[in-house]
């Protein structure tokens, strides 16, 4: 029961997944099984070198960035970095989901029938299952999580597929819980992609042939197996040690020197890993801890054992049948740092140092959770919320009553309230910059970046306070000294807040903010090729409503002919910004606002055809 509560799968589903994974060896691409309310898709593994490291990929680890259009969630929202995956595994997925196969139609049928879908596979078939699950989540589940059933991904001895961003994105979207990866203690396959291609290229073809269960037996005297195992674990050791140094903030001089010129594998564990020993199953869902365990569970206790482990690493890849059959007789431990981890790690042969590193990874996650709690305590405090409320409910309305709005009032800063607003602006910036610092250093849980309450607060803050930052920037003439606000002055806290909001509202449609923006611009019929428009709008403020005033400031000092495309783009975006709450309609059309004063100077022909003419009818009539 504890296992099912943690992973969402029971023994029967695991048994059926393994059975389907075996059947996939006999099919081309994938095998489908259906029983009751569950449909299982099992993927055929390959033991060809090209299906582990794509021969056309020249990088040291065969990696490639995911397509942002096809996988819009698989990135860091704030920084915008896209997840990296193994290209050979990705090509296997692309071959499966090719419209010429029956796979997509079969998935569609299961979706319409409201059946739970399980993706599974052994070895590299498990890698395909992982990517197929992400494909399903992006294509179906994210559109309406209340309608589409949660998928499950169950793998047996699968290699690592994606990088830390891949793992982070799954955590942020709360998808990590859908992935359960079974690993026997010495199985080499989950460690293979931690090695450089150059380290294993000579021995990999032979070892893959030995890993194929359709081969008769492992050649235990084969020196190439020992060479392969040694190379993989040497690179795994470097990756694990570098990772723990980054995690704890310590630095071993030799590792610092190594990392400066030696490329390290980008691949990292994702989801829940279930390590198996003779006595127990040990479940871990902390990616940093799993990485350490992939190295330290594969170590020998003495010289005699060391000589046997390379061949055990092959045999263990063939032992998942035994694992599945014996699950009901084994103890179950969840390695979360709350309970004693000694017995679990002892069974897995983890050394004292290894236990320290695993514990450090678990403790680091606790610190992330504590950091999040502290942030929540701060932003829920009455004095914090009062700062936002004062700007929103007192300062802004009083400025609007004077017919010039809070942007223009703050830009001049002649009143005592303007000074008070500046103090509150600085105090709020301090809080949000502290959060940003924690995000950049990965010192918050993955889920935080996608937390709806945080996104709402950050959006409220951005919409309300960024105009004050823009006013302050131009009041001090920084645009003349430093350059345009959008190019040189925009604080990162607003960029992160903007991207978080855009991701939240667009992900149900599987869309990317950048593409949505350019589609809107293209629909404005500006009379230029899109490439020309993109060059013209580079670093403009038309991509975000809270940057409205920055764009106005840039446009008002330039001849209309020079900025016509930017003017029309700004006008074309404005109505939607007003509807969405990005721009305050009452603020920008006030009699004394910078925007209104600038707009009335535009050519009469432009004004008479402007989408804003209804708002500015008096000005058009007067001119």
UniProtKB/Swiss-Prot annotation:
<keyword id="KW-0492">Microsome</keyword>
<protein>
    <recommendedName>
        <fullName>Protein EDS1L</fullName>
    </recommendedName>
</protein>
<dbReference type="InterPro" id="IPR044214">
    <property type="entry name" value="EDS1-like"/>
</dbReference>
<dbReference type="GO" id="GO:0005783">
    <property type="term" value="C:endoplasmic reticulum"/>
</dbReference>
<keyword id="KW-0611">Plant defense</keyword>
<keyword id="KW-0963">Cytoplasm</keyword>
<keyword id="KW-0539">Nucleus</keyword>
<dbReference type="InterPro" id="IPR002921">
    <property type="entry name" value="Fungal_lipase-type"/>
</dbReference>
<dbReference type="GO" id="GO:0006952">
    <property type="term" value="P:defense response"/>
</dbReference>
<dbReference type="InterPro" id="IPR029058">
    <property type="entry name" value="AB_hydrolase_fold"/>
</dbReference>
<dbReference type="GO" id="GO:0006629">
    <property type="term" value="P:lipid metabolic process"/>
</dbReference>
<comment type="function">
    <text>Positive regulator of basal resistance and of effector-triggered immunity specifically mediated by TIR-NB-LRR resistance proteins. Disruption by bacterial effector of EDS1-TIR-NB-LRR resistance protein interactions constitutes the first step in resistance activation. Triggers early plant defenses and hypersensitive response independently of PAD4, and then recruits PAD4 to potentiate plant defenses through the accumulation of salicylic acid.</text>
</comment>
<dbReference type="Pfam" id="PF01764">
    <property type="entry name" value="Lipase_3"/>
</dbReference>
<comment type="subunit">
    <text>Homodimer. Interacts with RPS4, RPS6, SNC1, SRFR1, AvrRps4 and HopA1. Interacts with PAD4 (via N-terminus). Interacts with SAG101. EDS1-SAG101 and EDS1-PAD4 form separate complexes in pathogen-unchallenged cells.</text>
</comment>
<dbReference type="Pfam" id="PF18117">
    <property type="entry name" value="EDS1_EP"/>
</dbReference>
<dbReference type="GO" id="GO:0005634">
    <property type="term" value="C:nucleus"/>
</dbReference>
<dbReference type="InterPro" id="IPR041266">
    <property type="entry name" value="EDS1_EP"/>
</dbReference>
<feature type="modified residue" description="N-acetylalanine">
    <location>
        <position position="2"/>
    </location>
</feature>
<keyword id="KW-0256">Endoplasmic reticulum</keyword>
<feature type="active site" description="Charge relay system">
    <location>
        <position position="317"/>
    </location>
</feature>
<keyword id="KW-0007">Acetylation</keyword>
<feature type="active site" description="Charge relay system">
    <location>
        <position position="187"/>
    </location>
</feature>
<keyword id="KW-0378">Hydrolase</keyword>
<feature type="active site" description="Nucleophile">
    <location>
        <position position="123"/>
    </location>
</feature>
<dbReference type="GO" id="GO:0016787">
    <property type="term" value="F:hydrolase activity"/>
</dbReference>
């Amino acid at each position: 029961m504890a296992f099912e509560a943690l992973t969402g799968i029971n023994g029967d589903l695991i048994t059926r997944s393994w059975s389907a994974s075996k059947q996939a060896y006999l099919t081309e691409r994938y095998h489908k099984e259906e029983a009751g309310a569950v449909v299982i898709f099992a993927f055929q593994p390959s033991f060809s070198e090209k299906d582990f490291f794509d021969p056309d990929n020249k990088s040291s680890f065969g990696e490639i960035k995911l397509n942002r259009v096809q996988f819009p969630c698989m990135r860091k929202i704030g920084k915008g970095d896209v997840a990296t995956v193994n290209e050979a595994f990705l090509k296997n997925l692309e071959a499966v989901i090719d419209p010429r196969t029956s796979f997509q139609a079969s998935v569609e049928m299961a979706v319409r029938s409201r059946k739970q879908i399980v993706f599974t596979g052994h070895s590299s078939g498990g890698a395909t299952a992982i990517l197929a699950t992400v494909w399903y989540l992006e294509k179906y589940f994210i559109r309406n999580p209340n309608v589409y059933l949660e998928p499950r991904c169950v793998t047996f001895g699968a290699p690592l597929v994606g990088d830390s961003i891949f793992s982070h994105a799954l955590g942020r979207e709360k998808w990590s819980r859908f992935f359960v990866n079974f690993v026997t203690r010495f199985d080499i396959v989950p460690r293979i992609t931690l090695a450089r291609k150059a380290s294993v290229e000579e021995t990999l073809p032979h070892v893959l042939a030995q890993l194929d269960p359709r081969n008769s037996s492992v050649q235990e005297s084969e020196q190439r197996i020992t060479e392969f195992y040694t190379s993989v674990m040497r690179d795994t050791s470097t990756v694990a040690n570098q990772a723990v140094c980054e995690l704890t903030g310590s630095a071993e001089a030799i590792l610092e020197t190594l990392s400066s010129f030696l490329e390290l594998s980008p691949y990292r564990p994702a989801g829940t890993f279930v390590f198996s020993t003779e006595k127990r199953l040990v479940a871990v869902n902390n990616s940093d801890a799993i990485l350490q365990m992939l190295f330290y569970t594969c170590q020998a206790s003495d010289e005699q054992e060391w000589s046997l482990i390379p061949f055990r690493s092959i045999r263990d890849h063939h032992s998942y049948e035994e694992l599945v059959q014996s699950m009901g007789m084994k103890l179950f431990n969840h390695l979360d740092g709350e309970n004693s981890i000694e017995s679990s790690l002892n069974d897995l042969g983890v050394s004292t140092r290894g236990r320290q590193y695993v514990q450090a990874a678990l403790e680091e996650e606790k610190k992330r959770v504590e950091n999040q709690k502290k942030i929540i305590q701060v932003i829920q405090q009455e004095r914090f919320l009062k700062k936002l409320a004062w700007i929103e409910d007192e300062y802004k309305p009083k400025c609007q009553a004077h017919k010039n709005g809070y942007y223009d009032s703050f830009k001049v800063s002649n009143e005592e309230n303007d000074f008070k607003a500046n103090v509150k602006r600085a105090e709020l910036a301090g809080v949000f910059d502290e959060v940003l610092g924690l995000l950049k250093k990965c010192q918050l849980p993955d889920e935080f970046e996608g937390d709806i309450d945080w996104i709402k607060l950050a959006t409220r803050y951005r919409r309300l306070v960024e105009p004050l930052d823009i006013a302050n920037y131009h009041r001090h003439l920084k645009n003349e000294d430093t350059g345009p606000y959008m190019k040189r002055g925009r604080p990162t806290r607003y960029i992160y807040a903007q991207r978080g909001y855009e991701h939240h509202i667009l992900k149900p449609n599987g869309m990317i903010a950048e593409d949505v923006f350019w589609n809107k611009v293209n629909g404005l019929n500006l009379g230029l090729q899109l490439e020309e428009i993109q060059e013209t709008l580079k670093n403009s403020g038309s991509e975000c409503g809270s940057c409205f005033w920055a764009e106005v400031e840039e446009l008002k000092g330039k001849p209309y002919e020079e900025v016509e495309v930017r003017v029309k783009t700004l006008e074309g975006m404005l109505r939607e910004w007003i509807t969405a709450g990005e721009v305050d309609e009452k603020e920008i059309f006030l009699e004394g606002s910078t925007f209104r004063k600038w707009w009335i100077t535009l050519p009469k022909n432009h004004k008479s055809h402007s989408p804003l003419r209804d708002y500015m009818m008096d000005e058009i009539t007067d001119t």
